[in-house]
């Protein structure tokens, strides 16, 4: 095994380190989505974990629970779209 193998091994180690650093930074990133003019707000991190949910009491109607369900889905989708857009930019700079 010549220097080519050692070089590839070193490159793999560097890529692994970059991946671990990126993964750690994802937990710190925050993406917010809102629906219903701010009635519902969802914040997720870069790993798509929900960090917080805020619901304005004015949209809580026990007669129509599907309203809050729809608002939550919309807010989450907005946050995820923002995250996906940033992730695609980040991935563009990766060698793999």
Swiss-Prot record:
This is Nucleoid-associated protein CF0672. Belongs to the YbaB/EbfC family. GO terms for cellular component: bacterial nucleoid; cytosol. It comes from the Bacteria. It comes from Chlamydia felis (strain Fe/C-56). It is found in: Cytoplasm, Nucleoid. Pfam families: YbaB_DNA_bd. The keyword Cytoplasm applies. The keyword Phosphoprotein does not apply. Binds to DNA and alters its conformation. May be involved in regulation of gene expression, nucleoid organization and DNA protection. Keywords: Cytoplasm, DNA-binding. One of its GO terms (molecular function) is DNA binding. Homodimer.
